[in-house]
């Protein structure tokens, strides 16, 4: 049917569509070469394993050679295939990664976006209330809100306003802020209806039009232990929602506010990516987390943030005070934590900001010492529905402006 539709389009429409499609692909890093060949040759390459787009191109990824005699309909069909190609989704991940970094840095920089303190509801907008900061309440006890005016103004509440929320809302906001940074404010305001940007309890989002978990989320990817994602490479992790959760039952929890940590992945270093691929995902690190927890059981905690100071900050004075019988244990813990995954798998978790995942595993030894913790990726649609929506928005932008290769994020 797709072929029939293509063949039925006027030539001028095909040409315009092809120009916009090729322009977007080139903006994402594809290079096209006309050659004396009879059929197109496509080299996508393992783009998600690369540190940067420049590295991918230098390795020969994202290259197309096609005949100059290729018919317009065939050309458009090939371009459409490339838009759906896994290598293109990985190239898009570089744009996504830059957006994640801008979004999470902005959220981290707002000292008035907090977790602790007395809240009147699940999300607290302070004395001025939600409407003054661009949000409208749709559920009682602060459990659900949608943007009241422009989407970008609503997110400004978390960039520069005074808001209190727990880490689950922090993750939702980071995910939505990433879309804002990916589109640019004008397109972000135009693309999404207010209900699509609902925030609140995770359970409540399922009954909304949320693009994260509701009716507009579309096609989810489920890879809890990151088996497939680890095989794809480091860029496949960027922007993904995930969580750290207690392994034993709630009866072992001493600090309920730290029973879990919700986060988005900001960056994955080369060593961390190699380790995840070698070990087949996160299950291996659940075992390492338990080993760390077991070793910690034999060391008495002294003062606040004891393990954080001992193992993350590696405070020399604190280490000097260790009784000789504990030094070998601490050395074993150091060796486990020196794994690149703990050092280079960088996440954003509200209100802790941008830190390596090892920091969080260590701090939870202090907060909830009677249970180990596990790490899982959450359901997500970054590489499916949200990628396709962004792609179509860029193609519409090209058609409206007549500027192939331009993005909605670009200055006018």
Predicted regions and their residues:
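Active-site nucleophilic cysteine motif
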Residues: 156-178
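Active-site nucleophile-His-acid catalytic modules used for acyl/amide transfer and hydrolysis
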Residues: 123, 127-130, 135-161
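Cationic-aromatic interfacial patches
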Residues: 21-83
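Low-complexity, highly charged intrinsically disordered N-terminal segments
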Residues: 179-184
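...with weaker cross-activation on analogous glycine-rich loops/strands in unrelated enzymes
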Residues: 198-273
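Boundary at the C-terminal end of the N-terminal hydrophobic targeting segment
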Residues: 13-18
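Bacterial N-terminal signal peptides
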Residues: 1-12
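Low-complexity, Gly/Ser/Thr/Pro-rich intrinsically disordered linker/tail segments
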Residues: 282, 287-412
